[in-house]
UniProtKB/Swiss-Prot annotation:
Gene from which the chain derives: TEX36
InterPro entries linked: HDNR
Compositionally biased spans, kind Polar residues: 24-39
UniProt-annotated stretches for the region Disordered: 1-52
Pfam families named among the record's database cross-references: HDNR
Protein name: Testis-expressed protein 36
């Protein structure tokens, strides 16, 4: 099938995909020295070595001859099958038990004037909270079956003595008639 108005390639090349017209299949994606991993010209590494400062060459020679005292611990394979390598100087520095603060046997480090009390372990909010016992009327429903029965259980103050009662500052504003409540429950 032909493609486009002005460009009509032959139909025998249908299905072949190239980034540009005229490329052959044998051309690799990239011909740089990094992808082929071979330098194209042998004199390029010598030029790079010539540009390096002389201190770098001296350090490189010293590093080959150096035998570091702590290189014994850097070898992972030598520590593979040994189980006591944490005691042989690796890891964190061990602090003597007398100077440790989290598990100290020194009485003077952790002793203070604090006297333990029964409120230890409680937050300030838990200590200051005062629980008020609510009076629960068991016959009270959200939507009562019969309003008259429930309201008859309460004896209200007469209107005349209302001001007199308020002057005395009563603790209970209404009372429950227990006979009526017990008859409602049964």
């Amino acid at each position: 099938m032909t493609k486009g108005r002005r460009f009509n390639p032959p139909s025998d090349k249908d299905g072949r995909w190239f980034p540009h017209i005229g490329l052959t299949q044998k051309t690799p994606e990239s011909i740089t020295s990094a992808t082929s991993k071979e330098p194209q010209s042998p004199h390029l590494p010598r030029q790079a070595e010539g540009k390096l400062p002389p201190i770098y060459k001296v350090r490189e020679k010293q590093a080959v001859n150096n035998q570091f005292p702590f290189s014994v611990h850097d070898n992972r394979h030598s520590l593979e099958n040994s189980g006591c390598y944490l005691d042989s100087g690796l890891g964190r520095k061990k602090i003597s038990p007398d100077k440790r603060q989290h598990v100290s046997r020194n009485f003077n480090l952790w002793a203070c004037d604090y006297v333990p009390s029964c409120l230890d372990g409680f937050s300030n909010n838990q200590i200051s909270y005062v629980y008020k016992e609510a009076m629960v009327v068991s016959s009270f429903r959200r939507f009562p079956r019969c309003y008259k029965e429930i309201w008859n259980a309460f004896t209200f103050l007469p209107e005349r003595s209302y001001t007199e009662v308020l002057k005395k500052k009563p603790k209970v504003r209404f009372t429950v008639d227990k006979k009526v409540v017990s008859s409602l429950e049964s």
